[in-house]
């Protein structure tokens, strides 16, 4: 079985998460339906929501390990490029800005899931949303001016579109540890 596909920027293949028994791995699914493993992970790690960087060189993933879920950036061959978050928060749903300078994700670091953004060059972390019901699955527009995400409300899950004005974000300082 394959799940959570991410189309490569050139449109030639997908990166998918594969599961077998208690292990999961990343695989490349080509247009001709051939599938080749990219990276296998031990039983202590669970990979989710891979997404290609705009230049196609990297994948951002959410990885569950040692009781927490963090954001990692992998090379296309599945080797670790950088660990983005490393703290007690559960971080998931990575999404790149179209220029590759920002990585957005949802996190429960305040007790409620909201959208955060990290400027990869400076390692500065910002809280982008502040909603009571939780915010998930960020999707920045190609021009960076709009952010769409899922949010819980009294009606269930809603799709919310908001201005992506960085002047409205709350700066949360630098990441807990330097990016690897």
Predicted regions span which residues?
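Beta-propeller blade-edge and WD-like acidic-aromatic loop motif
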Residues: 13, 17-39, 58, 62-83, ...
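Interface/linker segment at the passenger-translocator junction
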Residues: 172-180
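Conserved beta-propeller blade repeats
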Residues: 1-17, 42-62, 82, 86-106, ...
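A short local loop/turn or secondary-structure capping micro-motif enriched for an aromatic residue
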Residues: 3-5, 23-25, 45-46, 68-69, ...
């Amino acid at each position: 079985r394959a799940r959570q596909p991410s189309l490569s920027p050139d449109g030639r293949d997908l990166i998918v998460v594969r599961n077998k028994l208690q292990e999961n791995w990343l695989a490349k699914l080509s247009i001709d339906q051939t599938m080749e493993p990219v990276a296998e992970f031990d039983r202590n790690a669970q990979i989710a929501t891979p997404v290609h960087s705009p230049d196609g060189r990297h994948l951002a993933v959410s990885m569950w390990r040692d009781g927490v879920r963090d954001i990692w950036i992998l090379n296309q061959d599945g080797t670790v490029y950088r660990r983005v978050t490393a703290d007690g928060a559960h971080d998931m749903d990575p999404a790149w800005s179209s220029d590759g300078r920002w990585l957005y994700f949802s996190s429960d670091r305040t007790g409620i899931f909201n959208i955060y953004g990290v400027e990869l060059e400076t390692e500065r972390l910002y809280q982008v949303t502040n909603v009571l019901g939780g915010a998930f699955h960020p999707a920045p527009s190609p021009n960076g001016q709009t952010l769409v995400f899922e949010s819980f409300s009294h009606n269930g899950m809603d799709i919310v579109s908001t201005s992506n004005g960085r002047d409205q974000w709350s700066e949360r300082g630098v990441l807990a540890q330097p990016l690897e």
